Amino acid sequence: MKNLFNLFLMFFFAMPILSLSENPTNFSESCEDGSGETGSSFGIGFDLVLDFGLYRNSCPEAESIVYSWVETTVLEDPRMAASLLRLHFHDCFVNGCDASVLLDDTEGLVGEKTAPPNLNSLRGFEVIDSIKSDIESVCPETVSCADILAMAARDSVVVSGGPRWEVEVGRKDSRTASKQAATNGLPSPNSTVSTLISTFQNLGLSQTDMVALSGGHTLGKARCTSFTARLQPLQTGQPANHGDNLEFLESLQQLCSTVGPSVGITQLDLVTPSTFDNQYYVNLLSGEGLLPSDQALAVQDPGTRAIVETYATDQSVFFEDFKNAMVKMGGIPGGSNSEIRKNCRMIN
């Protein structure tokens, strides 16, 4: 298991950030601390009640097993932090946080892995498999794959220098998955701010949650095909959009024209690509957001612009809002047709 041209390497929402690999997705209100008290309940779909301390007695080794695998994997491949974070995003945004994104296709089930936003883009499945195997060996049929995704996402942020939060657990794993739901439900890297706000609100997430979760794009990479629209002023000879950094766009165009749009890849954050920090927002204010949907946060809406400015100047505010938004997103419930899988790739 176990300088401007140096942007050229891969990419998630997703992200995504987010790795927030090839087609990142753009992603609270205060949450309780880790007291062991009953946690979130979402009024969306099947009612889900989560608990901060569910596994303290039934599987006390669970969190340490997850952290050990994430730490080792990210040390070997820093991009994996974004990949694991993005897996959790893409899971929760499609019919809730139910590990449906992990199901392999079968003769009777065409799931989310082959949906356009995920195909040849999501990664990290083997890491989740390894974590699940180790946990099953000590606590069989106790810890859900959906909870593993939530803990692995948190630990990916932590080992990358970001904040830690208590993860509520008690999710169940879906026995179904939907390619169409993934195709229709995941935001595009070309989404406008109004579309993003609507998408997040439909899941019970606020505008602040959306801007905070988009900060996951401080990690990961993206293919040229994900940000072609950012290069349009250079390609068409039209005036640059408000907030565009022409030097930045020219460097991207050089990359994509040299190696080809389907091959060219670059960091979502060129300054601190493997560190979870607030540099993503600083980049947006200087016109160096990679994805159209990222740069839009700083130029299309005064409300999101104000949040971007706050996060760019105060990392502690970003960290606090990100933690709260992750807990809130992690409480989006799945359906009632669920179980605790023995193998995350297939139903029992």
Curated annotation (Swiss-Prot):
Binds 1 heme b (iron(II)-protoporphyrin IX) group per subunit. Substrate binds at residue 187. It holds the Pfam family peroxidase. Residues 177-189 have a biased composition (Polar residues). Ca(2+) 1 binds at residues 91, 94, 96, 98, 100. Ca(2+) 2 binds at residues 218, 269, 272, 277. Glycans are attached at residues 26, 190. Residues 170-189 are annotated as: Disordered. GO terms for biological process: hydrogen peroxide catabolic process; response to oxidative stress. The record marks 86 as: Transition state stabilizer. PROSITE patterns: PEROXIDASE_1 (PS00435), PEROXIDASE_2 (PS00436), PEROXIDASE_4 (PS50873). Its cofactor is heme b; Ca(2+). Heme b binds at residue 217. PANTHER family: PEROXIDASE 40, PEROXIDASE 72-RELATED. Removal of H(2)O(2), oxidation of toxic reductants, biosynthesis and degradation of lignin, suberization, auxin catabolism, response to environmental stresses such as wounding, pathogen attack and oxidative stress. These functions might be dependent on each isozyme/isoform in each plant tissue. This is Peroxidase 40.
